[in-house]
Design a protein with these regions (language model features):
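Glycine/serine-rich anion-binding loops at beta->alpha junctions
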Residues: 53-91
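A short, flexible low-complexity segment enriched in Lys/Arg and Gly/Pro that occurs
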Residues: 29-67
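Extended polybasic, low-complexity segments that bind anionic RNA or targeting/receptor surfaces
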Residues: 1-45, 92-211
């Protein structure tokens, strides 16, 4: 599939071919949700953990007889009712995490997300930025002229610093490296802008059957 490249410097538009093996994929909502859940669970490590009554150190002996005292029935002092007892329904730490996910599943999800963005006409490929620039005014004008507000920019290492400097004060714009390309950020923002070098890297990675 052919894409017309956007040009930050305002020169002539070039084209790039991206494999139909990526761009013709159908969007699987269940698969995408599974991968996003995995990603979010690993972004915020849940370290908080409380002891339940079976984990509290102490005797399991009843504190007094079942009958004859005139008081409410109780078991041991490890019950959540007592000070020093276990915590009822408290956080369990890493138990909530999805431990592993297949690499191929992540690749398929990324490819499907790119195809979805293309179908919705929200995928834009940008010519590599050869000159250094760090003015927000120039970059903001480019975004407005191309109606690219609320956008995620996936950049190669050579261009990343320029984008970070020029886009850090623009609302609803985020810059990430192609190595950190992920479906959560891609779906969070309306438009997806990928530099030419980054697109080639991502395409090669997705089509590589060995990894």
């Amino acid at each position: 599939m052919k894409f017309n490249l956007l040009n930050l410097e305002g020169g002539k538009s070039e084209t790039i071919d991206v494999s139909d093996k990526i761009m013709k994929l159908k969007f699987n909502h269940k698969l995408i949700k599974y991968v996003i859940d995995w990603q979010l669970n690993h972004q915020k490590p849940r370290t908080a953990k409380t002891k339940q009554r079976n984990e509290v150190r102490g005797s399991t002996k009843k504190i007094y007889a079942q009958k004859g005292t005139g008081q409410a029935r109780h078991a041991s002092k490890k019950a959540p009712l007592f000070v020093g007892g276990g915590q009822a329904h408290g956080p369990k730490g890493a138990v909530y995490k999805i431990k592993k996910i297949n690499k191929k599943v992540k690749k398929i999800a990324l490819a499907q997300t790119l195809a979805k963005k293309n179908t919705d006409k929200q995928l834009h490929i940008l010519s590599d930025v050869k000159k250094e620039f760090n003015k927000t005014k120039i970059f903001n004008k480019f975004l407005l002229n191309n109606n690219l507000t609320n956008a995620l920019i996936v950049s190669d290492k050579n261009s990343e610093k320029n984008f970070v400097r020029s886009a850090r004060n623009i609302k609803n714009i985020k810059v990430i490296s192609d190595e950190g390309a992920n479906i959560y950020d891609m779906l969070k923002y309306t438009n997806l802008i990928i530099t030419l070098t980054s697109m080639k890297k991502i395409e090669t990675r997705l089509l590589d059957e060995k990894n």
